[in-house]
Amino acid sequence: MTPIIGISTNLHTVDKGKFLGMERIYVNKDYIDAVVKAGGIPLLLPPVADRASIVRYAEVCDGFILSGGGDINPILYGDFPHPCLEEFHTGLDRAQWALTEEILRTDKPLLAICRGIQLLNVVLGGTLWQDITAIGHPVMLHSQYSPREDIFHPVSIEKDS
């Protein structure tokens, strides 16, 4: 049977034009394309506060991707916002936090990318460097302007992880 892969979505407030102030739910198309290419069925999971919906997401999906996105509100992991932070949506953070907890209860496969791995970290009790350059030594470029399919850094995947 073809696996259904739930993909967390993000929130953007329109900042110009006809729909100024409207909130949009989105995910980058790359996530959808990758799931389809791997033989899965992508299912976008809008952020909801309703516990019953979150539980149902976890039941329906065979695996999950916590997608990349904006900054997580540092208040949620016991810190104060650094001046370098971009916009954040605490409601989105709380909804994705609850989704992540439910995914962890299911023990189903989970791939967390960028914001997703940061979210997983704080849900499990970790903290974050809000400004990666503040750690005091050179770091790799984290926002590339080259084509997305270009390789920028190695990734090691542990067997059975």
Language model regions located:
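N-terminal beta1-alpha1 cap of cysteine-dependent amidohydrolase-like domains
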Residues: 1-111, 122-129, 133-160
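Hydrophobic, aromatic-enriched interface-forming segments
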Residues: 117-120
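Conserved G/P- and acidic residue-centered "switch" motifs that form tight phosphate/ATP-binding loops
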Residues: 114
